[in-house]
Amino acid sequence: MEPSTAARAWALFWLLPPLLGAVCASGPRTLVLLDNLNVRETHSLFFRSLKDRGFELTFKTADDPSLSLIKYGEFLYDNLIIFSPSVEDFGGNINVETISAFIDGGGSVLVAASSDIGDPLRELGSECGIEFDEEKTAVIDHHNYDISDLGQHTLIVADTENLLKAPTIVGKSSLNPILFRGVGMVADPDNPLVLDILTGSSTSYSFFPDKPITQYPHAVGKNTLLIAGLQARNNARVIFSGSLDFFSDSFFNSAVQKAAPGSQRYSQTGNYELAVALSRWVFKEEGVLRVGPVSHHRVGETAPPNAYTVTDLVEYSIVIQQLSNGKWVPFDGDDIQLEFVRIDPFVRTFLKKKGGKYSVQFKLPDVYGVFQFKVDYNRLGYTHLYSSTQVSVRPLQHTQYERFIPSAYPYYASAFSMMLGLFIFSIVFLHMKEKEKSD
């Protein structure tokens, strides 16, 4: 080998580990679609919070002809952020169908709209059970608007009481009022997967702010959604915000006070804390569960048998972990149930936490067949947790039955009494002589 070639080989040898380490250390790949690149500056605090948590952000305009989510059947990104409400046509090979396929593949999507909403976002919302109001409409509330509103009462002050009662999604800390300006949404009542994360007050409605009301508004009162979410059956997560301004630096740092006399003034909104909590949930930093080792055996044994016997006393245990700050830690829950199912559950009982795992002892039913130990945990804000272990339950062997059954003692007594009676009758009958008749 020539000296120059050897030197290059040694240089590559020493540089390869750092390069591989940098690749392995890169965070979740996230594509950010913007109306224009100025949004990077006006929403810098939100994007900085993502970068500080290790996200690898790729900024592009929504009409960039080089856009691509899927290449050769593989997803190029883990997450998608759409901060381009007015887009009419996505660039490259991205469209509503590819975004839907991205969600079907388990991808996470964060969408922010505005009153200038275009057809693609409206169509994407319909695919997820969300219906946006018409273009140029806005959420209006004549009783809960900010003191800095310009007169159309579209700068809404949303109370935290209207937030979804799910700390995993909206955060655990108490928040200041939320500042919102944007388009309203309604949820498809036939879609049970839609989450009403932030609703309007009972006095809010969605309509054209510069026109008199001539027809019933699209959304009225508590049915008006300001922020909505979706967790699909494959645990993919999507969040729709009717306001792009909700994520802006100006709304994060703004003071907030309702225009009603005597209203309390807050030096800062709760937008930043809520936006961070929502991003942690939608990008699966919070509320992610997984199943660890599962074991089952007869009480007093350590290994599972080839088949259980009816009425056996068994012990079942399962390890459930939760993702927290990038690490898997034991999950803490008191409402996890175990079902012992054939076609319908024969046993349903709560699992108790013991030594880092959940376990329970119970007696098998006096029914044989093919059963399943099943844990099906589906709670608001958490990924769907499912574990199923199939086992066989056989009847008692001939030598395992009791020789005498206590409940049959009366029948035993009747049989032996009949035998004894027959024996006595036979003796009497055989040895009794009839008296001879005298003349």
UniProtKB/Swiss-Prot annotation:
One of the Pfam families matching this protein, by short name: OST48_N
Give TM segment ranges.
411-430
Q: Where is the signal peptide?
A: 1-26
Arranged from A to Z, the UniProt key words for this protein are: Endoplasmic reticulum, Membrane, Signal, Transmembrane, Transmembrane helix
Where does the protein end up? Endoplasmic reticulum membrane
Recorded family membership: Belongs to the DDOST 48 kDa subunit family.
Biological role stated in the UniProt entry: Subunit of the oligosaccharyl transferase (OST) complex that catalyzes the initial transfer of a defined glycan (Glc(3)Man(9)GlcNAc(2) in eukaryotes) from the lipid carrier dolichol-pyrophosphate to an asparagine residue within an Asn-X-Ser/Thr consensus motif in nascent polypeptide chains, the first step in protein N-glycosylation. N-glycosylation occurs cotranslationally and the complex associates with the Sec61 complex at the channel-forming translocon complex that mediates protein translocation across the endoplasmic reticulum (ER). All subunits are required for a maximal enzyme activity.
Protein name (record):
Dolichyl-diphosphooligosaccharide--protein glycosyltransferase 48 kDa subunit
Organism expressing this protein natively: Pongo abelii (Sumatran orangutan)
Question: The organism's lineage?
Answer: Eukaryota, Metazoa, Chordata, Craniata, Vertebrata
The primary gene name is DDOST
